[in-house]
Amino acid sequence: MAHHNGPRKKTRYKFKKDLRKRGIPPVTSVIQSFEIGQRVHVVVEPSVQKGMPHRRFHGKTGTVIGQRGRAWLLEVRDGDSVKQVIARPQHLKAQKV
């Protein structure tokens, strides 16, 4: 039988974009930067596969704790535990204050 357990399984509707928002994201989403301690939302950009966090963290809010190359290191609560997530800036949105 075929292998059905890829990293994007069960994401048919979760990662779907609106009709008018399809295509590559603007450059401003790539060059955005964050402060350490800043709160950010994990919103997966399905057209960019590099640096994509696990589907479990889509829609969660975390705190920036560092940077790893072009990606950002986040602390995200997952149930009772706190997990570290590495994601590129295309998949992050700053929380409005």
Swiss-Prot record:
<keyword id="KW-0687">Ribonucleoprotein</keyword>
<dbReference type="GO" id="GO:0006412">
    <property type="term" value="P:translation"/>
</dbReference>
<keyword id="KW-0689">Ribosomal protein</keyword>
<dbReference type="InterPro" id="IPR036948">
    <property type="entry name" value="Ribosomal_eL21_sf"/>
</dbReference>
<dbReference type="InterPro" id="IPR001147">
    <property type="entry name" value="Ribosomal_eL21"/>
</dbReference>
<dbReference type="Pfam" id="PF01157">
    <property type="entry name" value="Ribosomal_L21e"/>
</dbReference>
<dbReference type="InterPro" id="IPR018259">
    <property type="entry name" value="Ribosomal_eL21_CS"/>
</dbReference>
<dbReference type="InterPro" id="IPR022856">
    <property type="entry name" value="Ribosomal_eL21_arc"/>
</dbReference>
<comment type="similarity">
    <text>Belongs to the eukaryotic ribosomal protein eL21 family.</text>
</comment>
<dbReference type="GO" id="GO:0005840">
    <property type="term" value="C:ribosome"/>
</dbReference>
<dbReference type="InterPro" id="IPR008991">
    <property type="entry name" value="Translation_prot_SH3-like_sf"/>
</dbReference>
<protein>
    <recommendedName>
        <fullName>Large ribosomal subunit protein eL21</fullName>
    </recommendedName>
</protein>
<dbReference type="GO" id="GO:0003735">
    <property type="term" value="F:structural constituent of ribosome"/>
</dbReference>
<dbReference type="GO" id="GO:1990904">
    <property type="term" value="C:ribonucleoprotein complex"/>
</dbReference>
